[in-house]
């Protein structure tokens, strides 16, 4: 059996708790028994490498990731197996972000921590807004780097496929669809179940430490890599 959460924010996301360091997330995830955690900050990834280093010796698998905001204002989880692929994707995102500094008084600070839970910097780029690349292009860029593109909180009333496009595109290259916890429970969904032709997943969308490990997805098979994990999701019967 494998427990995973593809959607966890750190203090690098302006909308998250400023105390949400990678170290605190790693420790909380281990306490709650989650096996895979994806660090997915808004258009940012500075904490992914820190989390990977901290988790290396404790049996927790960290997926380097990001929640990128497309030109259409659709939130898309970009998940990778290697830090280098995420770093290359980050360079692309930095080149297509809106120009300007983060309005801290409006969005909140974007805090960068080290391995000792100490604040070392503030990210001053404006990262909450949509980038200039469309959803289809972003999916291609993620897949071209060996990553997995997963539209986030698909049925949510904002920043989702259904809120921004009005539908879920078929055969669009998505590795899975992410559903918010409330939708997951109300619809009675299960990991890998086909919805709109894609495997269903769910995650905590944690913005506070107490949310880490509160809601996650489970498959019956034990897997050791992100490729095996997505393979297992894809093999679930429709």
Q: Over which residues does each language-model region extend?
A:
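Charged catalytic cores and adjacent phosphate/nucleic-acid-binding surfaces used
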Residues: 1-6, 10-34, 45-91, 110, ...
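Conserved Rossmann-like nucleotide-binding pocket used by diverse enzymes
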Residues: 38
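Short, cationic low-complexity segments
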Residues: 94-109
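Short, basic/glycine-rich phosphate-binding loops at helix/coil junctions
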Residues: 107-121
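Surface-exposed cleft-lining segments at the edges of enzyme active sites
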Residues: 118-130
